Amino acid sequence: IQALQSSFTGGINASFKLHTTTLDSPGQLFLSISSKSLDKNFDAMEELILSTLKKARFDEKNRIWDLLNIFIARNEESLNQNGHILAMNSAASSLNAFSASAYQMSGLQMLHQSKAAISKMKKVADANELIGTLQTIHSKIISSPFKIFTACSPKALTDKTFEFENIESKCEQSLIVPSNEQVAWITGSQVCYCAEAFQGVSREDPDAPALSVLATVLRNGFLHTAIREKGGAYGAGASNDTVTNTFKFFSYRDPKCSETFTAFKEAIEWSKTSISEQHLEEAILGVVSSIDKPLSPVGEAKNDFNFNLENISTKQRLEMRQRVINCSIDDLVRVSEKYLTKDSNKSILAGEAYKLSLIHI
């Protein structure tokens, strides 16, 4: 299969995506499979994707073992680059079931469980339990309906008929129950990645635009100076995550730890009295620019496809943009007091040198 991928495509990629609307909705988990090829290889690519999906083999135990080891090694190598993202996911995981599920699928808990699976396989010298789990997941995937996105030239679609089997069935899976643990992960890093998360809102909530603008104001108006310029971290900021309905603070490659969490708290207090019109205008411009950023024709089409999967219409996207533009300082102060004064959860990735200091955070 790898030889065929190299012959006809630029590779086949697969990833899971969790789509949510409100905290009361069940959410949806999608497996996204993508590839690209020349027009002349369009049919071969399509057939290869279907074959790879439907005819996956689980009898090559050594190959599965190797792939799991490669998967773990790549994720461990990415800790220094993505430590702030992993810390934010960990901090948010206690706030709601969506965050907890995302953490299990792509966070440090996923890496921890993968390493535990390898350790167990080595101990019992048997991969059958893992293979059984993979086969169960595979059977759920291939029995679910799927949607097709294709971006190509008109010529490639001439006389083309898609022959995808669409089995109308549902595979329901419960979301992960969040825990109340404050987690610190000890790594080989010489620095810290600090994160603090608060319960936020979904994209459809009227407060979502103000929270997005507030995140940018906090980053540019306070966190950059306090944590990067004065504290020596490589970066710091805040993020309004409408996928997991959380609001997050983070620092990146940070030589300090407890001082950073103090800075997060000070940033919240600063937002209640010190936001200027310039802060507001710059933040609105930044958020609108991210909404309006130009994409390639394929990128635009993919963007529309993903929004359609989430049942977000063009009208809703334009309304969201307008609500961002209409944000006032009073709106930012209101959402800061409403959401960022509640209970939060903290998480840290840090080296051994920080181990004792973590107990007091």
What are the residue ranges of the model-derived segments?
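Short, low-order "capping/linker" segments at domain edges
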Residues: 182-191, 293
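Conserved small/polar residues in nucleotide/adenosyl-binding loops
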Residues: 359-361
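Aromatic-residue-lined binding/catalytic grooves and analogous aromatic/hydrophobic interfacial grooves
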Residues: 124-128, 135-137
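M16 family metallopeptidases and their MPP-like homologs
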Residues: 1-55, 61-124, 143-152, 194-210, ...
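Extended beta-strand-rich architecture
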Residues: 153-186, 197, 203, 216
